[in-house]
Each structure stands twice: as C-alpha cells, then as structure tokens.
Swiss-Prot record:
GO terms for biological process: translation. One of its GO terms (molecular function) is structural constituent of ribosome. Pfam families: Ribosomal_S16. One of its GO terms (cellular component) is small ribosomal subunit. InterPro entries: Ribosomal_bS16, Ribosomal_bS16_dom_sf. It comes from the Bacteria. Belongs to the bacterial ribosomal protein bS16 family. It comes from Limosilactobacillus reuteri (strain DSM 20016). This is Small ribosomal subunit protein bS16. The lineage of its organism: Bacteria, Bacillati, Bacillota, Bacilli, Lactobacillales. Transmembrane segments: none annotated.
C-alpha cells in the first residue's frame, strides 16, 4: 500500500478549503483517508497553513510520500529540512 500526504478539497463552490491528509494513493482525492494532519486555507491573506509537525514527521519516517504541493508547504515550514537531517544524520 503506497501512502501519500496530500490535499483533500472541502468547502463550497468557489470557496475552497483543504485538509492535509494521509491517504492510500489509490483512494480518490476527496475519498477515504487514514488521518488528517493539518489544514490549508488559500483564501486568507496570507495563505493559512496549519499542520501537526510531529504527525507529519512520523508519517514521512514510515515512508509516506508528500504530493508536490504539500512538499512545497513542508519545505516552506522547514519540516523537509528536519526530516532530511534526521534521515541522514551520522549514527
């Protein structure tokens, strides 16, 4: 089972709101998911991104692959740098 960290669209027509979820890669975009790890609101200024950093790190260490958009959000927040340092730290 390939697991992805991606956006699930919510909200109403023309007023999108997204949840950052961990889901099976075969599941539909707005379908079943394993767990929700954050939210993204593109309508606010500046755009509002909230997520549970510990949960995201845990899923990345388990092998979950972030989508391109989520990867950019995690890089902006510094999570990908922490993950990379933890993964390749000298033991």
């Amino acid at each position: 089972m390939s697991v992805k960290i991606r956006l699930k669209r919510m909200g109403s027509k023309k007023r999108p709101f997204y949840r950052i979820v961990v889901a099976d890669s075969r599941a539909p975009r707005d379908g079943r998911f394993i767990t929700s790890v954050g939210t993204y609101n593109p309508l606010t200024t500046p755009k509002e991104v909230k997520f549970d950093e510990d949960a995201v790190m845990e899923w990345l260490q388990k092998g979950a692959q972030p989508s391109d958009t989520v990867r950019n959000m995690l890089q902006a927040a510094g999570v990908m740098k922490k993950y990379h340092e933890a993964k390749y730290a000298k033991k």
